[in-house]
């Protein structure tokens, strides 16, 4: 089960934790254990970014954007373990406390002050739940940092083909933490991109179906929430649904494929959309 995997391997899939940094191959990102010197941010990769093929592309795109902006980052690599978000949402408080204590000890040992992450679930846990356990850090979501870098001119994008994009609000980024403008500002900064809104957006946004640990449950009756949401996105006429959460990416991309919309409705993270405009030619994913 996912709980057993968390206990044994520190991630819900039960993947060997020694492979946590494999996604970063060739990018030259130092780990904290390497003694990287002064870094602006610790990049908290999260379980999905580390082990899920789709989301590995997202964290690579994020790292490439930060490198292009001259932001020095480091990772924990195999020393990172699940934040425990899923365990707490699913009612296993003991497992949450165990995982959280391990992470807080690691982060504090390295003197980490600032963290950036592309996962709103990790973001919410690190920012709002770790302080009670002795982990006090400045935590930003990658969309917030990217929007700031674009506004400051540290990150420059080239014009790309015209694209109509509908942005999907992640529950943990939006309603739980009030981050609505940053991902939209980042997308608007991309030349040739038109941002459209779905009827249910911002404070009235609609869950992708993965929240509250439902990512790890099987749907049994009724219409899947993710199917409803992709239909809503398709109705806007947009060619791309932009997301800012690994679970939203998984749920909506699967729903688009299951609903026969794979050719007409791409589901991509904000970082992937921006990274496409870093240089000529599309990137992976």
Write out the residue ranges for each language-model feature.
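Active-site glycine- and acidic-residue-rich loops that bind
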Residues: 51-58, 149, 172-189
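Local cysteine-cluster metal-coordination motifs and their immediate loop/turn environment
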Residues: 45-50, 79-90, 116-125, 166-177, ...
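A short, acidic, amphipathic alpha-helical segment used as a generic capping/interface helix at domain edges
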Residues: 221-239
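Long, compositionally biased charged/polar accessory segments in the mid-to-C-terminal portions
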Residues: 193-199, 217-226
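Short helix-loop-beta junction
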Residues: 60-73, 180-194
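Short, flexible loop segments at boundaries between secondary-structure elements
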Residues: 133-162, 200-203, 257-285
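A short, charged/proline- and glycine-enriched loop
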Residues: 36-41, 159-165
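Iron-sulfur-cluster electron-transfer modules
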Residues: 1-118, 123-130
């Amino acid at each position: 089960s996912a709980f057993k995997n968390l206990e044994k391997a520190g991630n819900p899939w039960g993947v060997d934790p020694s492979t946590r940094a494999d996604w970063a191959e060739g990018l030259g990102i130092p780990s904290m254990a390497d003694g990287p010197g002064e870094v602006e941010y610790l990049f908290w990769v999260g379980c999905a970014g580390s082990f899920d093929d789709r989301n590995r592309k997202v964290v690579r795109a994020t790292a490439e954007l930060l490198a292009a902006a001259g932001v020095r980052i480091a990772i924990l690599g195999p020393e990172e373990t699940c934040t425990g978000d899923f365990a707490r949402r699913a009612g296993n408080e003991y497992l949450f406390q165990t995982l959280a204590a391990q992470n807080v000890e690691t982060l504090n040992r390295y003197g980490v002050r600032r963290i950036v992450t592309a996962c709103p679930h990790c973001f919410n846990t690190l920012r709002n739940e770790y302080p009670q356990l002795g982990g006090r850090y400045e935590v930003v979501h990658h969309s917030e940092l990217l929007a700031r870098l674009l506004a400051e001119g540290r990150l420059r994008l080239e014009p790309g083909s015209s694209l109509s994009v509908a942005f999907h609000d992640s529950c943990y980024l939006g309603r739980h933490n009030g981050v609505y403008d940053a991902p939209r500002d980042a997308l608007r900064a991309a030349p040739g991109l038109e941002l459209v809104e779905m009827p249910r957006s911002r404070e009235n946004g609609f869950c992708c179906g993965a929240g509250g640990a439902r990512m790890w449950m099987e749907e049994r009756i009724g219409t899947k929430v993710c199917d409803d949401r992709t239909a809503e996105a398709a109705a806007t006429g947009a060619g791309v649904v932009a997301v800012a959460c690994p679970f939203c990416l998984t749920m909506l991309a699967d729903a688009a494929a299951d609903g026969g919309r794979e050719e007409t409705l791409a589901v991509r993270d904000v970082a992937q959309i921006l990274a496409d405009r870093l240089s000529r030619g599309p990137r992976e994913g």
